[in-house]
Amino acid sequence: MQTDATLDVNLTRALNESKRLADQTTPASDRWDVIVVGSGAAGGMASFQLAMAGVKVLMLDAGRMIDERTEYRTMEWPYASMRRHRLPPGERPIAVAEYNFVDRPYGANRLYEKSQKVLSYAGNSFTRNWVVDERQHPTTGTPYAWVRARVLGGKTNFWGRGALRYGPLQFNAASRDGFDVDWPISYDDVKPYYDKVDVLLGCAGTKEGLLQVPDGVFQRSSKLNCVEVAFKRAIAKMGRHYIPGRAGVTTEGVLNTKYRARCAGRGRCGRGCNIGAAFHSPTALVYPARDSGNLTIRPYSIVSEVLVGKESNRAIGVRVIDANTREVMDFKAPIVVLGAGTLDTTRILLNSKSAAHPNGLGNSSGLLGCHLSEHIMGIRGSGYMPVRIGTETTLDDGRPVSPYIPRFRNITDKHPDFIRGYHFQGGGGCGEYPGMAHEIPGYGKAFKSNVRKYYPAIISFGGFGEVLPRKENRVMLDPDVRDAWGIPVLRFDYRFGDNELKMAKDMADSIEEMLHEAHAEDIKIEREPLPPGWSIHEIGTARMGDDPKTSVTDKFCRLHDVKNVYIADAAPFVSGARRTPPGRSSRWRGGRPIS
């Protein structure tokens, strides 16, 4: 019988290392200057910056260590899995429609009672050992596709690698359209740290001089293929841009690291890059920080709350539940940095209740958990470009990100139906597999001929629209439901508003308009948004500001109420954009007052 590579990933080395580190790291085993919760982009950058500055750091991660040489299956052939990389029997992901129509908690629903493991939509044969089991990690409330990973590096092990900067349009959005408030910092404040991150970690792209997507310090980018060049020329007549994607990938190499090599153009980055070209927190940040001798990593450490001392405005450490033994331990340090991800960080703070902080730590404003924001997604379109119909197939695969159509709404003009904006990502040409074959009718020789005919000509795009940061979009603790470790879970109260739905309609109309302008054939448009949370870009639940009455953190991401607790993830972000959050640069800037 054929060997199923999906089930043959040997985790022995990672599991043994995880147990060793957890066993040897106790509250009494050392003294640390800073505790950092989380090991992904947020916790990784905070730990790296502090450790390199000579600060003794304890990194607490809820998951296990990772063996990237074994678990990053970049070079696995498609035929190595009998199920085309779908989950094995007994495990299943939550389907798109199930997020909206299945009663919550998802993992506890009768629909999944025969499943041994229930994963989010991001669960597949490559991520199944990283993403959480929804039965152990339930959530309640309105539908929300919350993707979580419990392994060293978190979601950076399979992120989308888009590395786009926020700019003045984002930091000063409220001044432009009158909705909500501006950030307490500007693009000029953050730009030097964007530049530092680009140099340290590598960012591939092209300089375009566009206000809506500021340029960075770029390495060599991927090129547009024939289909994409034809599309670019067509929409240029409409005043719109189509540029190579900007990727958190080193194509020319980075200095001072033995864990990363330059991109080899293999294109399977979502499985984890086993040469370290794509940014992953372990190889880019955590291992170099550990090599400094200043970083201690303790896996299997579920932080349930931040502890406050007799002085109610000072934290003294965190409470940890060992993921395996269930032992409860209190780790102490003068400073605590939360980088568990926007929603998990918020959950920890909400659960950090005391006589002095009855509604959670840092919640004197009552805004902790409010202003949840992300991207509205699912609007997409496709067609076939005449220039490539019936031509020979070419090698168009291997790029770390797809090309990008920057925002073109509400920049110099004002749309009558909505504020803020959106962008598209997508491309064309011959990928690893002709997925469009599923939509070509017929069978036999004629079917195969048509697949070959249209395979080189496909082009498709998906939209990302900004969700406005509304106070009523929020999370809170559910007093009646707990996770497998006895910690109250999050209850969501989150919905797309009128602005997002009108924006989504314009997205669909715009992509149809552009495909027609490019004379594409057999145009198909999907107008239905995906469930909330699909973008994995949640931000804003501990927003920053100068006034403690209207914000949770200051402009350095430090709690107004407790001056020695910092947030390293996207929870302090005031508003979003039509792109991924400016995470690593803000973490670098936010760490300066500590080091």
Task: Label every PLM stretch briefly.
Residues 1-34, 52-53, 67-85, 89-91, ...:
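Extreme N-terminal leader/targeting segments of oxidoreductases
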Residues 575-593:
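A conserved FAD-binding loop/helix module that cradles the flavin
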Residues 2-6, 83-145, 150-151, 155-170, ...:
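Conserved redox-cofactor binding core of oxidoreductases
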Residues 34-59:
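N-terminal Rossmann-like FAD-binding beta1-loop-alpha1 element of flavoenzymes
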Residues 52, 56, 62-89, 292, ...:
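Glycine-rich loop(s) and the adjacent beta-strand/alpha-helix scaffold that form part
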Residues 40-41, 222, 343, 572:
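Residue-level detector of alpha-helix initiation sites
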Residues 31, 244-248, 262-269, 304-307, ...:
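A glycine-rich dinucleotide-binding beta-alpha-beta segment and adjacent secondary-structure elements
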Residues 120-148, 152-155, 183-187, 365-490, ...:
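FAD cofactor-binding and catalytic pocket of flavoenzymes
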